[in-house]
Amino acid sequence: MATAKQNETFADTLATVLHQDAEHTVYRLGGTDGEVVQTVFPVFPGIEIVYHDVHATACAMQRTRAPGCLEIHHCREGRIAYPYGDACFFLSPGDLAIVRRSAAAAPARFPTGHYHGITVSIDPARAPDCL
């Protein structure tokens, strides 16, 4: 059963938990002009993998991160534009971006209204020392 709740891991976005178990959580994000689903897999403390399935033109899908977090983004299909400071980076199929977050980002844009990709997030303050 899906439950709607304000989830503090998503900046200013109403997230509906579609499924949750010991291995992953599936969210549907609100506040969009279409459908945005994120599947989140915690790997280790401070490290997670997020699959993005987007059929919308914009969404505040940025998960709240501590300053200094490292994100590795890969676009499998579609296109995404992420604001970053005074600039913006665009990913097309096959593109990869490595970003160090200093603050929460503005909403992502999807010029084609379609995006499938993956993000690996690493919070060095919480990640195991062996990594």
What are these regions (language model features)?
Residues 1-42:
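A short, N-terminal "cap"/entry segment at the start of jelly-roll beta-barrel domains
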Residues 27-131:
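N-terminal regulatory/effector-sensing and dimerization cores
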